[in-house]
Structure formats: C-alpha cells, structure tokens
A protein has these predicted regions:
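Active-site-proximal C-terminal subdomain of hydrolase catalytic domains
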Residues: 21, 31-38, 242, 247-338
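Alpha-helical transmembrane segments with an aromatic anchor "belt"
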Residues: 1-7
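Active-site microenvironments of hydrolase-like enzyme catalytic domains
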Residues: 190-218, 247-273
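Second-shell loop/turn segments in exported
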Residues: 132-139, 167-176, 214-220, 243, ...
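Solvent-exposed, polar/charged alpha-helical surfaces in well-ordered, non-transmembrane soluble domains
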Residues: 143-150, 154, 180-187, 227-231, ...
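A short, glycine/acidic-enriched catalytic loop
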Residues: 205-237
Length: 350
C-alpha cells in the first residue's frame, strides 16, 4: 500500500519541477499531508491481520506527514515553483530584484509620494486618495491604480493622491503596498485632511476569504486582513472614508471595517469571486464598471455602485459566470459629507 502512495508523491514533485505556478507549493504540502493520512487510514482497512501487518506501512505514512511539515516550513516555494523556461521567456521584461535594494529604496520612494500631497483647503470639501495594487505578478492591478489616479486628477486636481504598488516589472517605480507604507500613507492623508474632506481608499489584488493578497515574493510580504486595515484606519484617525476593494471574497472586509463615517464598496460578496484579473487588461471587471464607466457618468460613489453592479450582472450572465454579488455598506453619518463633496463637483461641471 505504501509503495503506490510514495510513487504518487514522487509524481507530484515531478510535476512541480517543471513549474506550474506560484501556488503549487502550498498544494504540494497539503497533498503530502493528505497522502500520509490516507496511508494511515488504509492501514486500518487493508493491513494484514496482526500487529506486524498494521505497522508495516507506518514508516511510509509518518515520512509523508513529516515531509509535508518540513515542506511548508523550510522550502522557499515561491522560488521553487516558477518554471525556469517561463522565467527565461520573460527575462527581458523583468529586472533582477534584489530584496535589500528594494527595501532600501522604500524610504525615498515613500517620502517622494508623501511630499506630493498638498494640504486641504480650509472649509472646502476635497477628495484625497490612497490607491494600492497588491499582487506583483499581473500588470492589471498596477494599471488600475494608474488609471484611477488619472481619473481622480481630472476630477479633483493633482496633489491629493498617494499610489502604492507591488510590481515585478517595475519594482521601484512606486512605493510597495506593504503594511508599513500603508500605515504611513493613511497617517499622511489624515494629517492633510480637514473635517469636511473625504478619503478614498482603493485596493485591487487577488483575495481570499480572510485577506487581501500583498504578494511580492522577493519582499516576503504578509497579506492584509480586515482586522489589519481596520486597525490602521483607527490608528491614523482617518474619518470620512470611502473604501473600495476589488478582489475575490472582498465582501469579507465589510463587517470589520463598518463604521458610521465609512462607505464600503467591494467587488464581490464574502463567499464569491470576482473576475477580469488577466494580464494585458487595463482594468478588472469591477474596476472597469465602477471607475472607468460609472464614475465617468456620475460623481456619486453610491450611484456609481448601482450602475456598476448592473453592468457586472450583465457581463457575468453573458459569459455564464457565477454571480460575484458586489456589496455596499453605508455608515449612518457619511451621507451628508458625500453629498457636500458631490454638490461642489457638480457645480464645477465635474
């Protein structure tokens, strides 16, 4: 019984060695553990009668379980599970990333980003923004950040937006979206905003049911959980906040972030995926519907959400995809601040 199981484990490793994606390492660790547990269970059913028969396959089962634990702890999966052939094909487009240089660049990049923030005009509602791209290995996320920044500059002027992005191809064009830079960016917004101003936080990345991916393997970043973001917002003292998250399962952020002075918009429900994160695209499906279409028709985030949701429902129905169910949660106190900001924008022809 243990010989076929070991053979299957070797086959799995062989598949991994040709490079089938950065997430395969986690799968292999789980697979090894499952194979070990399966072997233990099989011993109960198929082993020869007697103690010796039951113990015959025990070493193999324990070896698989130990291997799975060692795999998860010690093996640098992000380096191992990229195909060398695929890396060679893209070598001309991707610079060599030195982790030490990447981190040494952050203070300078972040200072330049924050120096570009202008203070708010007293008693005049204005929109400040922090935009973040979390996943370094697909260009669509940085593209969304850049294009959203361009849209906001046309609507609200320059000098009020901070951009953070993880990018394999342009690792030092913008500060990384990591925990430290995010905290500094939120505090900088809070320091420049007045009580009449609004902050837009937009995050675009992959997501799971408990976190937003901040994936940049050379930088060893940790994902952003709903609790992480809520804690950073509270620490910064940021008020009057619109939070837009374009990621799978992004609705899982709503309960933790909900507050009277916040409007929260997500691309999907907590148990649903969103779509459109392929390389070569300018926008994800939600980013396109919300920013590129709906917000060009209306300055009101709430009305734009309604318009974007209808667009997405239509696209998903046409393509036979499961519904993503975008979500919105409006705090009891943020409505008047939103209305004042949008009234000024409409009066100025925005």
């Amino acid at each position: 019984m243990s010989i076929p199981i070991l053979a299957l484990a070797v086959a799995i490793y062989g598949l991994a060695s040709v490079g089938i994606g950065p997430f395969f390492g986690a799968f292999l660790g789980v697979a090894l553990m499952a194979l070990g547990l399966y072997t233990l269970a099989a011993l109960r059913v198929f082993a020869r009668p007697g103690r010796a028969g039951r113990l015959a396959g025990l070493p193999a089962a324990l070896l698989l379980i130990a291997a799975s634990a060692a795999w998860e702890i010690y093996v640098p999966q992000s380096d191992l599970f990229y195909s060398a052939a695929l890396e060679d094909e893209a070598a001309d487009d991707i610079p060599e990333i030195v982790t030490e240089d990447l981190y040494y660049a952050q203070p300078t990049l972040m200072q330049a980003a924050l120096d570009g923030l202008a203070p708010g005009t007293p008693r005049e509602p204005e929109l400040f923004a922090l935009l973040g791209a979390g996943y370094a290995y697909q260009d669509v996320f940085m593209s969304e950040v850049d294009r959203t920044a361009t849209l906001l500059a046309a609507r609200h002027g320059t000098g009020r937006t901070v951009k953070l992005a993880n990018s394999e191809k342009e690792p030092t064009r913008l500060p990384m979206l990591n925990h430290h830079n995010l905290s500094d960016g939120l505090q900088a917004l809070a320091g420049r905003m007045g009580p009449e101003d609004m902050a837009l936080l937009f995050f675009t990345s992959h997501g799971s049911e408990d976190r937003l991916s901040l994936s940049f393997y050379e930088a060893r970043l940790e994902g952003l959980t709903p609790h992480d973001l809520a804690t950073k917002l509270d620490a910064a003292g940021l008020t009057n906040v619109v939070i837009v998250i374009s990621a799978c399962h992004s609705g899982s952020f709503i309960d933790e972030l909900a507050a009277p002075d916040r409007l929260i918009i997500t691309a999907s429900a907590a148990d649903r995926t969103s779509f459109g994160c392929a390389d070569g695209r300018d926008w994800t499906d939600f980013g396109r519907a919300f920013f590129d279409i709906a917000l060009r028709e209306t300055p009101d985030f709430r009305a734009a959400f309604t318009r974007a949701t209808r667009l997405i429902e239509g696209w998903e129905a046409e393509q036979g995809r499961p519904a993503s169910h975008p979500q919105i949660a409006e705090g009891a106190e943020i409505g008047p601040v939103l209305d004042a900001l949008f009234a000024i924008e409409i009066s100025q022809g925005g």
